[in-house]
Swiss-Prot record:
Residue numbers carrying Phosphoserine: 231
Cellular component aspect of the GO annotation: membrane
Comp. bias (Basic and acidic residues): 1-12, 48-59, 169-179
Bilayer topology annotation: Multi-pass membrane protein
Keyword Transport included in the entry's annotation: yes
Biological function: Mechanosensitive channel that opens in response to stretch forces in the membrane lipid bilayer.
Biased segments, Polar residues type: 115-145, 864-881
Species assigned in the record: Arabidopsis thaliana (Mouse-ear cress)
Domain of life: Eukaryota
BP GO terms, sorted: monoatomic ion transmembrane transport
Protein name per Swiss-Prot or TrEMBL: Mechanosensitive ion channel protein 5
Family: Belongs to the MscS (TC 1.A.23) family.
Keyword Ion transport: yes
Length: 881
């Protein structure tokens, strides 16, 4: 290993990429150093005061600077080797000069000289000593610093470490010279943890380059229209490449999933069937064979033991038959199938266990009667009976608890989120449909072509004329086009996507007829799906293409809106009209889609900015709804665990009462302990109960809602059982206990209807009435022209008068939105203020303070009315001595 000169005072920044454990990047600069090693702290030794021959100059410089020196371990051991090898030193100096001038030169002579000097074969390149390219570096500070390290420069530094050393020493010294410093990543991790869920990822560096724009919107394939939900995933290879996985859609025609229809023959069910056959056979033999009829065991007939074993082993099998009969009866009733079947399948295991234990208890009670207890003279039978009763009571209580929790959770989600889920899925359907080909127009064209082909065919039959071969080929092509499978499935009832839902079925749903199965499926679509463009619904697409179509940020939403606008509008058109929507949607869907845009119902057109705002708003709504459902699901699970603890305590108390353990003295001790627990945890239990009532009964907000509490506007960030996290206007997180929020008035902007606003300005009292009338007319015409912003005909009133000098005029107008998006509100308000100011300048309406008449009646007397000794302070320096 080559010795290191003390004049090598280069500054190193060594950065480690957290994603690649073995990646190290280093940079350095030096003008007169020869060493190129990367050191770590354990490879430094303090200089002992002796001066080498080759570092005299560097020592003088360090003494002048008052600094101390470092020497790498093993330096003295290899100093003679370096002195005996002057070409190596010259080559090193040459390489450093080239590096300082900005050139990078790779010399293979270094490797050859190292081989000749060490007389060892060259070390093969491995994962540990081969430099890596493309390293992402992180400096000591929390901000990331990107440094490019050229592989050949690192290779030269590594090769110089092998000069003059043996193979063993070479490996050891290379292990010593690896890393200088490792930057801490804790600040960056802490920032990632505190990031808001409602904020978007950073905007790409080059916003003009969009991966969705680079992909063609006219990808070939069969379009699956009318489906909403998760994007299809790439499946197994088929005849035409990768085909999507076909999953059953069990929710289209009925409300029962296919997985519950299929009978599952497990290993235990198979054993139960074998046991049933064997035990029934032995029971028949014991009842028919004379020798076995008199056989007893513990003074009990053999057939009674066989019946007991039959109930214990095969009781679950018999109880499953009873459950199947109950389910069959429920399925036959339409109302029960909509409302009850979900809960029946949810608790079928608990019902099966209850029936099984009930059969066991009946068999035990009637077979092991009082006579057997007297003959055996044992009290164990009594305790066995009590234990069976305890288990049966526990299962019944647990069954009731499960049913209540499922019913309450389903009714809560259905009454609170069904309308929002339905609207969000329809918005997703509109976005996906408008981003694809005009299917309705294509369908109409194919129907016309099909009709023409049929007319020509019928005419040929009636007239008896023969068509030319070219015309026959054209007619056949028309008939083939008319049978396109992708278009015939627009109104079909059956699909292939198990996680999707058809738009016609979605429109028929409401809070009265939606089943619990469908409600659960809709929630899963929101939680697991994402808004995307139409490209993902084509066949023969890869996972990369599907990811490129998903909308995961507001920037991607704006790109999707731009793509939709160019796809829907005619060439050269600046607006989207209802006729453009009719090329993609049916008439009912097109009218409903037009009503989603602000001001489109009055102006009958949609601008590009209006479309962009709508897509961004749809993305925000979808993200907030997904976060709300996720937090609500988490809260329900935690509430379920709390109820499990409470029910467990109740079951234990009931067990003690049934087993007779709870005597009077025991109850007295237990009551005293309960009083102590109530004194300690009573306030906490009260807080938890109030928080549960606030979250599930009152439920004044959801994630993403803008609220006003104590005069401060806050945005809901996260909802928990005990607390709610808010974001203030400056993104400061504020945590409120739910029990405290239950006692405060909460204003919810999101749930409010279209809200009003007021703009006030003052004019002088002497302003002519003609100008005031003119400014009123200008304001009214401006607001009426902005139909997508405000409702027409705002109120303009004289609000107040200030000391007979000015009159305050107020403009009361109503936005076509609520104040959930406060930034958009102030943007529109600013536009109106600019218009008011522009109008005032054009009409020469200014607020000028007219001169006031001041009458001076008397002045205070002075000692010398003609002169005064007072002078300004600045004149003091100008006076002479």
């Amino acid at each position: 290993m080559a010795a290191v000169d003390s004049t090598d005072r280069r500054d190193f920044i060594v950065n480690i990429n957290g994603q690649e454990s073995g990646a190290v990047g280093a940079t350095g600069s030096s003008s007169n150093a020869e060493g190129g090693n990367i050191w770590k702290e354990s490879s430094y030794d303090f200089w002992d005061g002796e001066k080498g021959k080759n570092d005299k100059k560097g020592d003088d410089e360090d003494e002048d600077g008052g600094s101390f020196h470092f020497r790498q371990r093993g330096e003295r051991r290899h100093s003679s080797a370096e002195l005996s090898d002057p070409p190596s030193k010259l080559i090193g100096q040459f390489l450093h000069k080239q590096r300082a001038s900005g050139d990078e030169i790779s010399l293979d002579v270094e490797l050859n000289m190292a081989e000749l000097q060490s007389n060892t074969p060259p070390r093969p390149a491995t994962a540990s000593n081969t430099p890596r390219r493309g390293l992402t570096t992180i400096s000591e500070s929390s901000s990331p610093v990107k440094t490019k390290v050229k592989a050949d420069a690192v290779r030269r530094r590594q090769n110089r470490t092998s000069l003059g050393g043996s193979s063993d020493e070479e490996g050891r010294n290379r292990d010593e010279a690896e890393v200088l410093k490792c930057g801490s990543k804790k600040p960056m991790l802490s920032r990632n943890k505190t990031k808001s869920r409602l904020q978007d990822p950073p905007t790409p560096t080059h916003p003009a380059i969009d991966k969705t724009e680079m992909k063609s919107g006219r990808r070939s394939g069969i379009f699956k229209s009318g489906f909403l939900g998760k994007s299809p995933k790439a499946g197994t290879p088929g005849r035409n490449g990768f085909e999507e996985e076909e999953e059953e859609d069990p929710f289209l025609d009925e409300d029962l999933p296919e997985e519950f229809k299929r009978d599952k023959l497990s290993f235990w069910v198979f054993l139960e069937w074998i046991s049933l056959v064997l035990i029934v056979t032995s029971l028949v033999c014991s009842l028919t064979i004379h020798n076995l009829q008199r056989k007893t065991w513990w003074k009990l007939d053999l057939w009674k033991w066989e019946v007991t074993v039959l109930v214990l082993i095969c009781g679950r099998l018999v109880s499953s038959w009873i459950v199947r009969i109950i389910v069959f009866l429920v399925e036959k009733n339409f109302t029960w199938r909509k409302r009850v079947l979900y809960f029946v399948y949810g608790v079928r295991k608990s019902v099966q266990n209850c029936l099984w234990l009930g059969l066991v208890l009946l068999a035990w009670h009637f077979l092991f009667d009082k006579k057997v207890e007297r003959e055996t003279r044992s009290t164990a039978l009594r305790y066995v009976t009590r234990v069976l009763v305890c288990l049966l009571v526990a299962l019944i209580i647990w069954l009731v608890k499960t049913i209540l929790v499922k019913v309450l959770a389903s009714s809560f989600h259905m009454s609170t989120y069904f309308d929002r889920i339905q609207e969000s899925l329809f918005t997703q359907y509109v976005i996906e449909t408008l981003s694809g080909p005009p299917l309705m127009e294509i369908q109409r064209m194919e129907e016309e072509e099909q009709q023409v082909a049929e007319d020509v065919k019928s005419l040929e039959k009636l007239a008896g004329a023969k068509l030319p071969p070219a015309l026959k080929a054209t007619v056949k092509s028309f008939m083939k086009v008319g049978k396109s499978p992708g278009l015939n499935r627009i109104g079909s009832k059956r699909g292939e996507d198990g996680e999707g839902i058809r738009i016609d079925q979605l429109k028929r749903m409401n809070t009265k007829n939606v089943s619990a199965w469908n409600m659960k499926r809709l929630m899963n679509i929101i939680l697991k799906g994402a808004i995307s463009t139409l490209d993902q619904n084509m066949q023969d697409t890869t996972q990369e293409d599907e990811d490129a179509t998903h909308i995961r940020s507001e920037y991607e939403a704006k790109c999707a809106a731009r793509k939709i606008f160019h796809n829907v509008t005619e060439p050269g058109s600046r607006y989207i009209y209802l006729e453009d929507f009719l090329r993609f949607l049916c008439e009912e869907e097109a009218e409903r889609a037009m009503a989603l845009f602000e001001g489109a119902s009055e102006s009958d057109k949609i601008s590009k900015s209006c479309l962009k705002n709508w897509v961004v708003k749809a993305f925000r709504e979808r993200r907030a709804l997904a976060l709300t459902l996720n937090d609500t699901k988490t809260a329900v699970d935690r509430l379920h665990r709390i109820i499990n603890v409470v029910i467990g305590i109740i079951i234990i108390i009931i067990w003690l009462l049934i087993l007779g353990i709870a005597t009077t003295r025991f109850l007295l001790v237990l009551s005293s302990q309960l009083l102590l627990v109530a004194f300690v945890f009573g306030n906490s239990c009260k807080t938890i109960f109030e928080a549960i009532i606030f979250l599930f009964v009152m439920h004044p907000f959801d994630v993403g809602d803008r609220c006003e509490i104590d005069g401060v506007q806050l945005v809901v960030e996260e909802m928990n059982i005990l607390t709610t996290v808010f974001l203030r206007y400056d993104n400061q997180k504020i945590i409120y206990p739910n029990s405290v929020l239950g006692t405060k008035p909460i204003a919810n902007y999101y749930r409010s209807p279209d809200m009003g606003d007021a703009v006030e300005f003052c004019v002088h009292i002497a302003t002519p009435p003609e100008k005031i009338t003119a400014i009123k007319q200008r304001i009214l015409s401006y607001v009426d022209n902005k139909k997508d912003y405000w409702y027409p005909a705002p109120m303009i009133v004289f609000l107040s008068m200030d000391d007979l000098n000015s009159v305050k005029i107020a403009v009361w107008l109503t936005h076509r939105m609520n104040h959930q998006d406060m930034g958009e509100r102030y943007i529109r308000r600013g536009l109106l203020l600019e218009e008011v100011g522009k109008t005032c300048r054009e009409l020469d309406i200014e607020y000028r303070l007219y001169p006031l008449n001041i009458n001076v009646r008397s002045l205070p007397p002075t000692a010398n009315p003609t002169s005064s000794d007072r002078i300004p302070p600045s004149w003091m320096q100008q006076r002479g001595p």
